[in-house]
Amino acid sequence: MFTGLVQAIGRLEPSSHGIWVRGALEGLGSMALGDSIAVDGVCLTVAEMDAAGGGFRADASEETLSRTTLGRRAQARALVNVEPALRLSDRLGGHLVSGHVDGLGTVLDIEPLPSSWRLSVAWQDPSYGRYICEKASLTLDGISLTVAGCEAGGVSFWLAVIPHTWEHTTLKQRRVGDAVNLEVDLVARYLERLLLDQATTEGATPTQAPLTAHWLADHGWASGSPHA
């Protein structure tokens, strides 16, 4: 598990056995072979270390390289966000992140504001829009962010990025049209599964059991009466 708080930035390089991340070890503290590590939000395993060069190699399957941005970014030798796995004694400053990318997004707009940046993104697969709502947690390229607003049922949304996050991650490298790795909040996935299981035991199929405010209130998941 991870928190979405980036600890180091490295430079990605392709390898015949996965990927190399160069220049990131200094910011990661102690690290050993077999450790889990998130690279641009993708959970990988450290397979080789190069202490002299300040880098490490991680195994990555063809599926991982093709279904995330890692394959194309390795070819471009792009900068990537790196975070070691969460210890039980660590502070949870971001939110719980599994490192299992749900899908890709496309950067629609990057707007500088007086004290922040507004980053607009759209899912490449619109079906993931159901997990997005205002104030929801979201991981973008391994960075824990909060949804500031959304439209089209969550298919497109925007994120407020503070200066510290902008300067200490790869966000400032992003351009309109870039693909980004996205992982939705684990809580949203678990809640959906629980509610759909409950609905199907009552005789409805998942497609017949929409998660509405009425349904949530009727089943004790929301306070107040939806009929008031």
Predicted regions and their residues:
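Conserved loop->alpha-helix
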Residues: 1-228
